[in-house]
């Protein structure tokens, strides 16, 4: 593969779905949306779910299929509420687009408001009034990570669709397609690493693959490259760190922690996040091997949450992470 190809193209744009059928891992939701497209009878929509699961791609695909390739750009606009959280974005940008007539004989236009849960309560109230005022010639598609942060009057005016986190199989299938198209060689552990770092986020998976391909343009992409380019610890190292600390070997665990912090260059928050993930994903064999009771697991999760909070408040990474390992070691019944 040519190195210039990696530099010139942004893969999340190149491989973004352009039709609803191409949106991965949301089969039930997509089938319901396709029924709206088929009749061109579209209500206001609210898409809820984690990042990188197809919410934006679905909104754009709806516009493409309803208006056609020639007219969808004229009848569709996308705004990101996290950039402008206040009421002005509703009063100006949204109203200016909503009050103009649809182009090309279309019955309505579509306004896609991404990260709508970032809008303040006042801005959401203004948005609700705007939705009512322009309902004859405008349809709103709102996207959010947390539907609980959308005021009830807006939710009641929308058909709500919940996008789930993508399965490992859906992520891998898309990565295999891209690898074939880009003529990439990816090892089995490379695919496993991409699935691990993505955590069900297709956008993150594709970006991680492109970053690794840029670093190793003419080599087989393995898990080492993936973890290095995404600033992620090898999950095996995290499991070993946890196991060492839980067995009471604090000094050995601290040495491994220092390696992750200073040699691997990982952040404290990333390490805590991976420790939490490893604890959550422990299988029964490891739980039995370490002698972990249900009560002890609850205590571990509780202290992980406390350390994570302290780090977000600006506490010293090394001290907090060592305190976490110390808590693990002290919980050893031996």
UniProtKB/Swiss-Prot annotation:
The keyword Nucleotide-binding applies. GO terms for molecular function: ATP binding; ATP hydrolysis activity; DNA binding; DNA clamp loader activity. InterPro entries: AAA+_ATPase (IPR003593), ATPase_AAA_core (IPR003959), DNA_pol3_clamp-load_cplx_C (IPR008921), DNA_Rep/Repair_Clamp_Loader (IPR050238), P-loop_NTPase (IPR027417), Rep_factor-C_ssu_arc (IPR023748), Rep_factorC_C (IPR013748), RFC_lid (IPR047854). ATP binds at residues 49-56. Gene3D superfamilies: 1.10.8.60, 1.20.272.10, P-loop containing nucleotide triphosphate hydrolases (3.40.50.300). One of its GO terms (cellular component) is DNA replication factor C complex. The keyword tRNA processing does not apply. SUPFAM superfamilies: P-loop containing nucleoside triphosphate hydrolases, post-AAA+ oligomerization domain-like. SMART domains: AAA. Keywords: ATP-binding, DNA replication, Nucleotide-binding. GO terms for biological process: DNA repair; DNA-templated DNA replication. Belongs to the activator 1 small subunits family. RfcS subfamily. Heteromultimer composed of small subunits (RfcS) and large subunits (RfcL). PANTHER family: REPLICATION FACTOR C / DNA POLYMERASE III GAMMA-TAU SUBUNIT, REPLICATION FACTOR C SUBUNIT 4. Part of the RFC clamp loader complex which loads the PCNA sliding clamp onto DNA. This is Replication factor C small subunit.
């Amino acid at each position: 593969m040519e190195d210039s190809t990696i530099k010139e193209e942004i893969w999340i744009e190149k491989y973004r779905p352009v039709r609803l059928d191409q949106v991965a891992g949301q089969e039930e939701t997509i089938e319901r949306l396709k029924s709206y497209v088929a009749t061109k009878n579209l209500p206001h929509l609210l898409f809820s779910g984690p990042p990188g699961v197809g919410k934006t791609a679905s909104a754009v695909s709806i516009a493409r299929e309803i208006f056609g390739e020639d007219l969808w750009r004229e009848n569709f606009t996308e705004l990101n509420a996290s950039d402008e959280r206040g009421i002005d974005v509703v009063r100006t940008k949204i109203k200016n687009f909503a009050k103009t007539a649809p182009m090309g004989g279309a019955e309505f236009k579509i306004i896609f408001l991404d990260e709508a849960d970032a809008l303040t309560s006042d801005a959401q109230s203004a948005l609700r009034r705007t939705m009512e005022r322009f309902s004859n010639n405008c349809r709103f598609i709102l996207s959010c990570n947390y539907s609980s942060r959308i005021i009830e009057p807006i939710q009641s005016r929308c058909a709500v669709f919940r996008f789930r986190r993508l399965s490992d199989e859906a992520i891998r299938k898309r990565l295999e397609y891209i690898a074939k198209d880009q003529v990439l060689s990816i090892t089995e552990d490379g695919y496993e690493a991409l699935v691990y770092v993505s955590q069900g986020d297709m956008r993150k998976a594709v970006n991680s693959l492109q970053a690794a391909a840029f670093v190793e343009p003419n080599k087989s992409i393995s898990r080492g490259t993936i973890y290095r380019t995404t600033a992620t610890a090898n999950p095996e190292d995290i499991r070993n760190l946890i196991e060492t600390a839980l067995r009471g070997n604090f000094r050995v665990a601290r040495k491994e922690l220092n390696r992750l912090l200073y040699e691997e260059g990982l952040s404290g928050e990333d390490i805590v996040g991976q420790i939490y993930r490893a604890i959550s994903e422990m299988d029964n064999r490891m739980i039995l091997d370490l002698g972990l009771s249900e009560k002890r697991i609850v205590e571990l999760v509780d202290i992980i949450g406390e350390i994570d909070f302290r780090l977000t408040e600006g506490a010293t990474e090394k001290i907090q992470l060592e305190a976490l390992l110390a808590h693990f070691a002290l919980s050893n019944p031996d």
